[in-house]
Regions:
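Inter-motif core of Ras-like GTPase G domains
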Residues: 1-24, 33-43, 49
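Active-site glycine-centered loops adjacent to acidic/histidine catalytic or metal-binding residues
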Residues: 53
Length: 213
């Protein structure tokens, strides 16, 4: 394993996989994409390949239409494409997979992931990196949503008590307990992020970049 304090980890590129069969792209997928962009950094977009899969689940017309929508959407892949990223299709067979790997092997330039550059060269704290800020923002948004739901349920319980409606009160109380559990989980994620050492985070981020994206 590299010693990241002394040696920067260089990569040939990054792969982001997306199902072309997805009719719409949900909030979770958009957040994952944004996090991917923060980890890579705009300077590395030229070394990104967006691989679309599940082409056997759509007609050629449907797939090509969605492909164009993905390329042209500002909240999806347009920022990557504008930065020099490429898009490739994978139909589940061996040939397109080999072509994608060949594209990477033919590249002469290497890149350093933004997250690695921030932690190693700039000596930033995890929370001050672009990816760290993005994750904190996501966690805050989720926490605010849960807290809003909690307030609504507490209002519902209070109103049910005033009206003597035991069924509504009990159902709302069950939902309230679930929301409190969700809030506790988000707060735990916050604490875990704050307590993660920079060295450990560098190792994890490098592993993720090499094995997941």
């Amino acid at each position: 394993m590299h010693r990241y304090e002394e040696q920067t980890s260089y990569l040939v590129g990054f792969i982001y996989v997306h199902r072309i069969s997805d009719i719409r792209v949900g909030g979770t997928s958009k957040r994952n994409l944004k996090m991917f962009q923060r980890i890579c950094g705009t300077d590395s977009f030229k070394n990104v390949t967006v691989v679309t899969t599940m082409w056997d689940k759509v007609t050629s017309e449907e797939g090509e239409g969605r492909e164009q929508e993905l390329k042209q959407s500002d909240v999806l892949f347009k920022p990557l494409m504008d930065g020099g990223a490429t898009m490739a299709r994978h139909d589940g067979t061996r040939e397109p997979a080999l072509k994608i790997m060949q594209w990477f092997s033919d590249k002469n330039d290497t890149v350093v992931a933004k997250i690695v550059d921030e932690l190693v060269k700039e000596k930033k704290n995890i929370l001050d990196t672009e990816a760290g800020k993005e994750l904190q923002s996501d966690l805050r948004n989720v926490l605010q949503k849960h807290q809003k739901n909690l307030q609504a349920l507490e209002d519902e319980i209070r109103e049910a008590k005033q009206q003597g409606d035991k069924n509504v009160e009990e159902e709302a109380a069950v939902d309230r307990r679930k929301v409190l559990e969700d809030i506790a989980k988000v707060k735990w994620e916050f604490e875990k992020l704050r307590n993660t050492s920079s060295k450990k985070f560098r190792c994890v981020s490098s592993f993720v970049l090499c094995n997941w994206f």
